[in-house]
UniProtKB/Swiss-Prot annotation:
Belongs to the complex I 20 kDa subunit family. The lineage of its organism: Bacteria, Pseudomonadati, Aquificota, Aquificia, Aquificales. This is NADH-quinone oxidoreductase subunit B. Binds 1 [4Fe-4S] cluster. GO terms for molecular function: 4 iron, 4 sulfur cluster binding; iron ion binding; NADH dehydrogenase (ubiquinone) activity; NADH:ubiquinone reductase (non-electrogenic) activity; quinone binding. It is a peripheral membrane protein. [4Fe-4S] cluster binds at C36, C37, C101, C130. It is found in: Cell inner membrane. InterPro entries: NADH_UbQ_OxRdtase-like_20kDa, NADH_UQ_OxRdtase_20Kd_su.
Amino acid sequence: MASSINGNGFITTTVDELLSWGRRNALWPVTIGLACCAIEMMHAAASRFDIDRLGMIFRASPRQADVLIVAGTVVNKVAPMLKLVWDQMPEPKWCISMGGCASAGGPFPTYSTLQGIDRIIPVDVYIPGCPPTPQGLIYGLLELQRKIREKKVTRYEKAFEEFKKDLSPELLNGVGV
């Protein structure tokens, strides 16, 4: 967190930095595991790699999640349901495309396979591989945290516009925090 400690031991920061810190260190992913990438995702959540140590708790409901991890092949019949899950997630939300199938349709593109989930929902991080390793997923999640910290995810700013309207200008500029 970009903050400073003054002579009295208080930390001063801005509201945006505080919200960014909280968001990036408490990501709650909902998963769409459609193929072999889902096995690697489960492996990343198990005791050897323990994704929970990064502050991530998998959620079963999209209404309680802020990160969508799509792992595996998305066929055209599943695409509307994937869009529905994305629309049910509250803002700010982010998406990770895990594996070659979710990112580009897989090694054998067919008429029934969606050629990348970025055709229907915005993707923030792509994780390559067939299937990607658990280390690859963890690296992708750390990259998402870095993007949130550096505010390279534009939907993040849009999500707090209503919140910022209710605050006084002094708080928004970091004075009095």
